[in-house]
Amino acid sequence: MMKVLVVVALLVTLISYSSSEGIDDLEADELLSLMANEQTRKECIPKHHECTSNKHGCCRGNFFKYKCQCTTVVTQDGEQTERCFCGTPPHHKAAELVVGFGRKIFG
C-alpha cells in the first residue's frame, strides 16, 4: 500500500510540474505576441502625421483605422507635389458621432 501511495504522489508531482511548464511556455508565447503587437503599434503613423511614403501605415483610431488622405500642393515655383496625412474620413467621423450619441443616450 505504501508503494502505491509513493507512486501516486510521484505521478501527481510530475503531472503538476509538466502542466506548470506548459503554462509558463504559454505565458511566454503570449508575452512575445503582446510585445510584437506593441512594436507594430509604435511603428504606425499617428493621426495628423505625414504618410506620403507609407500610405498603409496609419494607426487605428477609436473605432476605425485612420486613412491616408492625400492632397496636391503647388509650391511657389509651380511644382505640384503630393502630400498625405493620416486622418479620419468623413463617413467614419459620422459613424463615430452616431455611436457616441448612442452611448450617451443608452449609457
Curated annotation (Swiss-Prot):
Q: Which GO terms describe its cellular component?
A: extracellular region
| Tissue/organ expression | Expressed by the venom gland.
Cystine connections? C44-C59, C51-C68, C58-C86, C70-C84
- Identify the main location: secreted
Domain of life, per lineage:
Eukaryota
Signal peptide residue numbers = 1-20
Q: Where in the cell is it found?
A: Secreted
Ordered alphabetically, the record's keywords are: Disulfide bond, Knottin, Secreted, Signal, Toxin
**Domain comment (free text):** The presence of a 'disulfide through disulfide knot' structurally defines this protein as a knottin.
Tell me which family the UniProt entry assigns to this protein. Belongs to the neurotoxin 19 (CSTX) family. 04 (U1-Lctx) subfamily.
Q: What is this protein called?
A: U1-lycotoxin-Ls1d
- Tell me what organism the protein belongs to: Lycosa singoriensis
Provide the organism lineage as a comma list: Eukaryota, Metazoa, Ecdysozoa, Arthropoda, Chelicerata
